Amino acid sequence: MRKKPIIIGVTGGSGGGKTSVSRAILSNFPDQKITMIEHDSYYKDQSHLTFEERVKTNYDHPLAFDTNLMIEQLNELIEGRPVDIPVYDYTKHTRSDRTIRQDPQDVIIVEGILVLEDQRLRDLMDIKLFVDTDDDIRIIRRIKRDMEERDRSLDSIIEQYTEVVKPMYHQFIEPTKRYADIVIPEGVSNIVAIDLINTKVASILNEAK
């Protein structure tokens, strides 16, 4: 009988350090079959819209995501079957024609701002983490990331943050903190929290042997 993979949900606000926490877990288990799947990969296809319409999309709202597809593909991985994960093109604001083949793993980290918002997704998780970071730090990180990696202007980033990102955080993301098993202040720099999480994952892996 095939053992079920450990599924770890990692959430928090945009620019809050979710990816860094996820990578800290990944790097602690170099000999395990472990991967990270980003909720951002499942933004809905918008190829039927004009570019002008796409840029107005609220990417911090639950309806922006094809969470049904993510749940479907996670269940496939749980059953031991590979999946083709979509790739999102941030410069065109729609789904790319490419996909990435993902084979089943022993540990799957599910990372994204709204991965604890949907109960069906939460029910698949063994460990749920919320990375809790101050608003000021998150906006600075978001500006740096979006200008360097997504070719965004400073004005557009600030406008999106004040009109969409911040209000959506308080409406949809922050309330999911109550579902977390562990809340991590300071993100990846919280060594005690990271060590506790890695110890728990190692314990579950050992029990499954």
Swiss-Prot record:
GO BP annotations listed: CTP salvage; UMP salvage
Subcellular location: Cytoplasm
Reaction(s) this enzyme catalyzes, per UniProt: uridine + ATP = UMP + ADP + H(+); cytidine + ATP = CMP + ADP + H(+)
Pathway: Pyrimidine metabolism; CTP biosynthesis via salvage pathway; CTP from cytidine: step 1/3; Pyrimidine metabolism; UMP biosynthesis via salvage pathway; UMP from uridine: step 1/1
Enzyme superclass (EC): transferase
InterPro entries according to UniProt: P-loop_NTPase (IPR027417), PRK/URK (IPR006083), Uridine_kinase (IPR026008), Uridine_kinase-like (IPR000764)
Gene3D superfamilies: P-loop containing nucleotide triphosphate hydrolases
GO MF annotations in UniProt: ATP binding; cytidine kinase activity; uridine kinase activity
CDD domains per record: UMPK
Binding site for ATP: G12, G13, S14, G15, G16, G17, K18, T19
Keywords: ATP-binding, Cytoplasm, Kinase, Nucleotide-binding, Transferase
Pfam families per UniProt: PRK
GO cellular component: cytoplasm
Intrachain S-S bonds: none
EC code(s) of this entry: 2.7.1.48
The UniProt record lists the keyword Ubl conjugation: no
Family matches, as NCBIfam families: PRK05480.1 (NF004018), udk (TIGR00235)
Membership in a protein family: Belongs to the uridine kinase family.
Protein name (record): Uridine kinase
Species for this entry: Streptococcus agalactiae serotype III (strain NEM316)
